[in-house]
Protein backbone atom coordinates (compact mmCIF):
# COMPACT_ATOMS: atom_id res chain seq x y z
CA UNK A 1 0.00 0.00 0.00
CA UNK A 2 1.67 3.13 -1.29
CA UNK A 3 0.69 6.77 -1.45
CA UNK A 4 1.77 10.06 -2.97
CA UNK A 5 1.16 13.66 -1.93
CA UNK A 6 2.22 17.06 -3.23
CA UNK A 7 1.94 20.57 -1.79
CA UNK A 8 3.46 23.92 -2.61
CA UNK A 9 5.33 26.85 -1.17
CA UNK A 10 3.73 30.19 -0.34
CA UNK A 11 4.73 33.72 0.59
CA UNK A 12 3.31 35.90 3.34
CA UNK A 13 0.68 38.58 2.85
CA UNK A 14 0.10 39.14 6.58
CA UNK A 15 2.09 37.34 9.28
CA UNK A 16 -0.17 36.01 12.05
CA UNK A 17 2.44 36.25 14.84
CA UNK A 18 1.07 39.56 16.15
CA UNK A 19 -2.70 39.02 15.98
CA UNK A 20 -3.47 35.37 15.23
CA UNK A 21 -4.91 36.33 11.84
CA UNK A 22 -2.80 35.98 8.74
CA UNK A 23 -2.65 35.43 5.03
CA UNK A 24 -0.44 33.88 2.39
CA UNK A 25 -0.45 33.28 -1.35
CA UNK A 26 0.81 30.19 -3.15
CA UNK A 27 3.95 30.14 -5.30
CA UNK A 28 5.26 27.57 -7.76
CA UNK A 29 7.78 25.60 -5.66
CA UNK A 30 6.83 22.11 -4.53
CA UNK A 31 7.30 19.34 -2.00
CA UNK A 32 6.49 15.72 -2.83
CA UNK A 33 5.99 12.84 -0.42
CA UNK A 34 5.94 9.12 -1.21
CA UNK A 35 5.08 6.58 1.45
CA UNK A 36 4.79 2.84 1.84
CA UNK A 37 2.79 1.44 4.73
CA UNK A 38 4.59 -1.09 6.93
CA UNK A 39 3.64 -2.88 10.13
CA UNK A 40 5.49 -0.53 12.44
CA UNK A 41 8.31 1.98 12.64
CA UNK A 42 9.06 5.19 10.79
CA UNK A 43 12.02 5.35 8.43
CA UNK A 44 12.98 7.18 5.30
CA UNK A 45 14.72 10.16 3.79
CA UNK A 46 14.15 13.88 3.35
CA UNK A 47 15.93 15.70 0.54
CA UNK A 48 15.79 19.48 0.21
CA UNK A 49 17.20 20.83 -3.03
CA UNK A 50 19.42 17.80 -3.38
CA UNK A 51 20.75 17.96 0.19
CA UNK A 52 19.86 15.48 2.91
CA UNK A 53 17.77 16.89 5.79
CA UNK A 54 17.86 14.95 9.03
CA UNK A 55 15.08 16.43 11.21
CA UNK A 56 12.17 13.95 11.21
CA UNK A 57 10.12 15.50 14.05
CA UNK A 58 7.41 16.67 11.66
CA UNK A 59 7.18 13.28 9.94
CA UNK A 60 6.73 11.53 13.28
CA UNK A 61 4.12 14.08 14.35
CA UNK A 62 2.15 13.62 11.12
CA UNK A 63 2.13 9.85 11.59
CA UNK A 64 0.91 10.23 15.18
CA UNK A 65 -1.83 12.69 14.19
CA UNK A 66 -3.06 10.50 11.30
CA UNK A 67 -3.05 7.40 13.51
CA UNK A 68 -5.28 9.23 16.00
CA UNK A 69 -7.58 10.62 13.30
CA UNK A 70 -8.10 7.29 11.52
CA UNK A 71 -7.79 4.80 14.35
CA UNK A 72 -5.35 2.89 12.15
CA UNK A 73 -2.11 1.48 13.52
CA UNK A 74 0.68 1.54 10.95
CA UNK A 75 4.29 2.40 10.26
CA UNK A 76 5.70 4.06 7.17
CA UNK A 77 8.69 4.13 4.92
CA UNK A 78 8.82 7.63 3.44
CA UNK A 79 10.64 9.65 0.84
CA UNK A 80 10.21 13.43 0.87
CA UNK A 81 11.73 15.59 -1.83
CA UNK A 82 11.42 19.38 -1.68
CA UNK A 83 12.27 22.40 -3.80
CA UNK A 84 11.50 24.69 -0.84
CA UNK A 85 14.47 25.86 1.25
CA UNK A 86 14.12 25.30 5.00
CA UNK A 87 14.20 28.06 7.60
CA UNK A 88 13.68 30.91 5.13
CA UNK A 89 10.01 31.74 5.73
CA UNK A 90 8.81 29.99 2.56
CA UNK A 91 6.45 27.51 4.27
CA UNK A 92 8.60 24.41 3.94
CA UNK A 93 7.03 22.81 7.04
CA UNK A 94 3.46 23.46 5.88
CA UNK A 95 4.18 21.95 2.48
CA UNK A 96 5.87 18.88 3.95
CA UNK A 97 3.04 18.26 6.42
CA UNK A 98 0.36 18.66 3.74
CA UNK A 99 2.13 16.39 1.26
CA UNK A 100 2.74 13.71 3.87
CA UNK A 101 -0.85 13.73 5.15
CA UNK A 102 -2.13 13.30 1.58
CA UNK A 103 0.35 10.50 0.87
CA UNK A 104 -0.54 8.54 4.01
CA UNK A 105 -4.27 8.85 3.41
CA UNK A 106 -3.83 7.65 -0.16
CA UNK A 107 -1.81 4.68 1.09
CA UNK A 108 -4.54 3.89 3.62
CA UNK A 109 -7.17 4.10 0.88
CA UNK A 110 -9.12 6.77 2.77
CA UNK A 111 -10.42 9.92 1.10
CA UNK A 112 -9.80 13.23 2.85
CA UNK A 113 -11.10 16.71 2.03
CA UNK A 114 -8.41 19.36 1.46
CA UNK A 115 -9.37 21.45 4.51
CA UNK A 116 -9.31 18.37 6.74
CA UNK A 117 -5.86 17.47 5.43
CA UNK A 118 -4.70 21.01 6.16
CA UNK A 119 -6.03 20.85 9.72
CA UNK A 120 -4.23 17.57 10.38
CA UNK A 121 -1.00 19.02 9.02
CA UNK A 122 -1.39 22.08 11.26
CA UNK A 123 -2.02 19.83 14.26
CA UNK A 124 1.15 17.92 13.43
CA UNK A 125 3.16 21.13 13.04
CA UNK A 126 2.03 22.25 16.50
CA UNK A 127 2.88 18.84 17.94
CA UNK A 128 6.34 18.96 16.36
CA UNK A 129 6.96 22.50 17.62
CA UNK A 130 7.73 23.92 14.18
CA UNK A 131 5.09 26.67 14.32
CA UNK A 132 4.05 29.49 16.63
CA UNK A 133 0.50 30.20 15.43
CA UNK A 134 -0.27 26.83 13.86
CA UNK A 135 0.29 28.43 10.45
CA UNK A 136 -3.19 27.62 9.15
CA UNK A 137 -2.76 30.51 6.70
CA UNK A 138 0.47 29.09 5.33
CA UNK A 139 -0.90 25.55 5.20
CA UNK A 140 -4.03 26.70 3.36
CA UNK A 141 -2.07 28.61 0.73
CA UNK A 142 0.34 25.68 0.43
CA UNK A 143 -2.34 23.13 -0.41
CA UNK A 144 -5.11 25.23 -1.98
CA UNK A 145 -3.02 27.83 -3.78
CA UNK A 146 -4.29 31.34 -4.39
CA UNK A 147 -4.71 33.94 -1.68
CA UNK A 148 -5.81 32.52 1.68
CA UNK A 149 -6.74 34.71 4.66
CA UNK A 150 -7.35 32.87 7.92
CA UNK A 151 -7.97 33.07 11.64
CA UNK A 152 -5.20 30.85 12.97
CA UNK A 153 -6.63 30.88 16.49
CA UNK A 154 -9.67 29.00 15.16
CA UNK A 155 -8.13 27.27 12.14
CA UNK A 156 -10.75 29.03 10.04
CA UNK A 157 -10.44 30.00 6.37
CA UNK A 158 -11.99 33.48 6.13
CA UNK A 159 -11.35 34.22 2.47
CA UNK A 160 -9.78 32.56 -0.54
CA UNK A 161 -9.41 33.90 -4.04
CA UNK A 162 -7.65 32.79 -7.20
CA UNK A 163 -4.64 34.79 -8.37
CA UNK A 164 -3.03 35.31 -11.75
CA UNK A 165 0.29 33.46 -12.25
CA UNK A 166 2.32 36.68 -12.17
CA UNK A 167 6.11 36.56 -11.76
CA UNK A 168 7.60 36.47 -8.27
CA UNK A 169 11.22 37.19 -7.42
CA UNK A 170 12.57 35.55 -4.27
CA UNK A 171 15.54 36.86 -2.31
CA UNK A 172 16.91 34.00 -0.21
CA UNK A 173 19.75 35.01 2.14
CA UNK A 174 22.24 32.42 3.36
CA UNK A 175 21.13 32.40 6.99
CA UNK A 176 18.20 30.33 8.21
CA UNK A 177 15.80 31.19 11.03
CA UNK A 178 13.87 28.36 12.64
CA UNK A 179 10.43 29.38 13.90
CA UNK A 180 11.08 27.78 17.29
CA UNK A 181 13.73 30.45 17.96
CA UNK A 182 11.01 33.13 18.10
CA UNK A 183 8.82 31.42 20.70
CA UNK A 184 8.07 33.69 23.64
CA UNK A 185 8.66 36.90 21.68
CA UNK A 186 6.08 39.62 22.42
CA UNK A 187 4.60 40.94 19.18
CA UNK A 188 1.91 43.09 20.83
CA UNK A 189 3.75 46.32 20.00
CA UNK A 190 3.11 45.85 16.28
CA UNK A 191 -0.38 44.35 16.56
CA UNK A 192 -2.25 47.61 15.69
CA UNK A 193 -0.36 47.96 12.41
CA UNK A 194 -0.75 44.30 11.48
CA UNK A 195 -4.47 44.47 12.26
CA UNK A 196 -4.74 47.33 9.75
CA UNK A 197 -2.81 45.30 7.17
CA UNK A 198 -5.07 42.29 7.65
CA UNK A 199 -8.23 44.40 7.33
CA UNK A 200 -6.79 45.86 4.15
CA UNK A 201 -6.19 42.36 2.75
CA UNK A 202 -9.75 41.31 3.62
CA UNK A 203 -11.01 44.31 1.63
CA UNK A 204 -9.09 43.10 -1.41
CA UNK A 205 -6.03 45.32 -1.04
CA UNK A 206 -3.70 42.42 -0.31
CA UNK A 207 -0.80 43.79 -2.34
CA UNK A 208 -0.72 46.94 -0.19
CA UNK A 209 -1.09 44.79 2.91
CA UNK A 210 1.97 42.67 2.13
CA UNK A 211 4.17 45.76 1.77
CA UNK A 212 3.03 47.17 5.13
CA UNK A 213 3.41 43.77 6.77
CA UNK A 214 6.90 43.36 5.31
CA UNK A 215 8.13 46.75 6.46
CA UNK A 216 6.71 46.41 9.98
CA UNK A 217 7.97 42.86 10.61
CA UNK A 218 11.36 43.56 9.02
CA UNK A 219 11.89 46.52 11.34
CA UNK A 220 10.63 44.57 14.36
CA UNK A 221 12.66 41.41 13.73
CA UNK A 222 15.82 43.24 12.71
CA UNK A 223 15.83 42.40 9.01
CA UNK A 224 17.09 45.04 6.56
CA UNK A 225 14.32 47.00 4.84
CA UNK A 226 16.60 47.94 1.95
CA UNK A 227 15.44 45.04 -0.28
CA UNK A 228 11.84 46.24 0.01
CA UNK A 229 12.91 49.83 -0.68
CA UNK A 230 14.90 48.75 -3.74
CA UNK A 231 11.91 46.82 -5.09
CA UNK A 232 9.51 49.71 -4.50
CA UNK A 233 11.80 52.07 -6.39
CA UNK A 234 11.58 49.71 -9.37
CA UNK A 235 7.78 49.65 -9.21
CA UNK A 236 7.54 46.18 -7.68
CA UNK A 237 5.41 45.08 -4.73
CA UNK A 238 7.63 43.52 -2.08
CA UNK A 239 7.37 41.98 1.36
CA UNK A 240 9.01 39.75 3.95
CA UNK A 241 7.93 36.12 3.86
CA UNK A 242 7.07 34.71 7.26
CA UNK A 243 9.74 35.31 9.87
CA UNK A 244 12.26 35.84 7.09
CA UNK A 245 14.95 36.07 6.12
CA UNK A 246 13.49 35.59 2.61
CA UNK A 247 11.93 38.54 0.81
CA UNK A 248 9.71 38.34 -2.25
CA UNK A 249 8.38 40.73 -4.87
CA UNK A 250 5.66 40.75 -7.49
CA UNK A 251 6.92 42.47 -10.62
CA UNK A 252 6.42 42.61 -14.37
CA UNK A 253 10.19 42.81 -14.85
CA UNK A 254 11.53 39.94 -12.74
CA UNK A 255 14.95 39.81 -14.41
CA UNK A 256 15.60 43.48 -13.64
CA UNK A 257 14.70 43.13 -9.96
CA UNK A 258 16.53 39.81 -9.67
CA UNK A 259 19.72 41.50 -10.84
CA UNK A 260 19.24 44.40 -8.40
CA UNK A 261 18.51 42.07 -5.51
CA UNK A 262 21.49 39.82 -6.24
CA UNK A 263 23.71 42.15 -4.17
CA UNK A 264 21.70 41.14 -1.09
CA UNK A 265 21.88 37.39 -1.66
CA UNK A 266 20.68 34.54 -3.85
CA UNK A 267 17.64 35.24 -6.02
CA UNK A 268 15.16 33.05 -7.86
CA UNK A 269 12.27 33.73 -10.19
CA UNK A 270 9.03 31.78 -9.84
CA UNK A 271 5.33 32.69 -10.08
CA UNK A 272 2.12 32.89 -8.10
CA UNK A 273 -0.25 29.94 -8.36
Curated annotation (Swiss-Prot):
GO terms for cellular component: cytoplasm. It is found in: Cytoplasm. It catalyses: shikimate + ATP = 3-phosphoshikimate + ADP + H(+). Its EC number is 2.7.1.71. It comes from the Archaea. Coiled coil: none annotated. Pathway: Metabolic intermediate biosynthesis; chorismate biosynthesis; chorismate from D-erythrose 4-phosphate and phosphoenolpyruvate: step 5/7. Keywords: Amino-acid biosynthesis, Aromatic amino acid biosynthesis, ATP-binding, Cytoplasm, Kinase, Nucleotide-binding, Transferase. InterPro entries: GHMP_kinase_N_dom (IPR006204), Ribosomal_Su5_D2-typ_SF (IPR020568), Ribsml_uS5_D2-typ_fold_subgr (IPR014721), SK_arc (IPR010189). Pfam families: GHMP_kinases_N. ATP binds at residues 85-95. One of its GO terms (molecular function) is ATP binding. The keyword Nucleotide-binding applies. The keyword Cell inner membrane does not apply. GO terms for biological process: amino acid biosynthetic process; aromatic amino acid family biosynthetic process; chorismate biosynthetic process. Its main location: cytoplasm. Belongs to the GHMP kinase family. Archaeal shikimate kinase subfamily. This is Shikimate kinase. It comes from Thermococcus gammatolerans (strain DSM 15229 / JCM 11827 / EJ3). The gene is aroK.
Amino acid sequence: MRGYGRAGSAVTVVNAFATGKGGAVGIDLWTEAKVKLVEDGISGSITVRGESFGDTRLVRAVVEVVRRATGEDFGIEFEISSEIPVGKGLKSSSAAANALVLAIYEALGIEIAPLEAIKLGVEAARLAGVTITGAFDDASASLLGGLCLTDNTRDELLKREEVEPEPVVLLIPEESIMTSSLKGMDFSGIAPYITEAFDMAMRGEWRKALVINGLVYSAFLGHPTEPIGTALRLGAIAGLSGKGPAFFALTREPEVLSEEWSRFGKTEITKLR
